[in-house]
């Protein structure tokens, strides 16, 4: 007995599997739910995806997603031009903005260095970042790439560029999450936490 329903449903399931964290079973449930119960919402979803693909582009300054030449953060006169935070994705910008602890500007790499995957500096906009650093009044560069092998390699690569331009570089701290228990923390995270310790006030 075939596990397929129709070619159109199979195609929908394949496309839904492109979403992060969505496997075959979840994609199948989502597809069938859209077709069984929420056809109106499914049509709205299709329109919203098409609309986003048409209207959303990259900010000409920071590479974040926007619908104009500049994103709202780059347009804002209230942001501190002296501080630039480098992140891997627009999701990281949203996460930092939700803390309300940062008032500087951003540069979104849209990825990280990964030679094994053929992703080099030019693929993530490092040349554009260097030009921005040369032309702006940045006095601190914050590296907020992910604490992965690729994220660390990307941070080191960008740090060398900034240091050549005499721009001070800092790295966001990595360590134990608030409410976490030491016995449940992996050794790599615990090592970062110990190395990044600071005086207790």
Swiss-Prot record:
Zinc finger regions, C4-type: 59-74
Protein name: Recombination protein RecR
UniProt xrefs under SUPFAM superfamilies: Recombination protein RecR
Keyword Zinc-finger (UniProt): yes
Toprim domain residues: 82-177
Gene3D superfamilies associated with the record: 3.40.1360.10, 6.10.250.240, RecR Domain 1
Family matches, as CDD domains: TOPRIM_recR (cd01025)
GO biological process: DNA recombination; DNA repair
Provenance organism: Hahella chejuensis (strain KCTC 2396)
Similarity comment: Belongs to the RecR family.
GO molecular function, one term: zinc ion binding
Keyword terms of this UniProt record: DNA damage, DNA recombination, DNA repair, Metal-binding, Zinc, Zinc-finger
Keyword set includes Transcription: no
Function statement: May play a role in DNA repair. It seems to be involved in an RecBC-independent recombinational process of DNA repair. It may act with RecF and RecO.
């Amino acid at each position: 007995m075939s596990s397929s329903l129709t070619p159109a449903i199979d195609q929908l399931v394949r496309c839904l599997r492109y979403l992060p964290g969505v496997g075959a079973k979840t994609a199948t449930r989502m597809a069938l739910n859209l077709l069984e119960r929420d056809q109106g919402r499914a049509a709205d979803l299709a329109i919203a995806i098409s609309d986003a693909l048409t209207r959303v582009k990259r900010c000409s300054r920071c590479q974040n997603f926007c619908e104009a030449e500049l994103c709202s953060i780059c347009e804002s006169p209230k942001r501190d031009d002296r501080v630039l935070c480098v992140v891997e994705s627009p999701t990281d910008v949203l996460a930092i903005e939700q803390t309300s602890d940062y008032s500087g500007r951003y540069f979104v790499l849209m990825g990280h260095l990964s030679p094994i995957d053929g992703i080099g500096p030019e693929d993530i906009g490092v040349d554009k970042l260097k030009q921005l650093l040369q032309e702006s009044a940045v006095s601190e560069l914050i590296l907020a790439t992910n604490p992965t092998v690729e994220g660390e390699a990307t941070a080191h690569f960008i740090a060398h560029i900034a240091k050549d331009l005499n721009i001070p570089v800092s790295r966001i701290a990595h360590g134990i999450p608030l409410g976490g228990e030491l016995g449940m923390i992996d050794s790599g995270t615990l090592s970062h936490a110990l190395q990044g310790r600071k005086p207790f006030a």
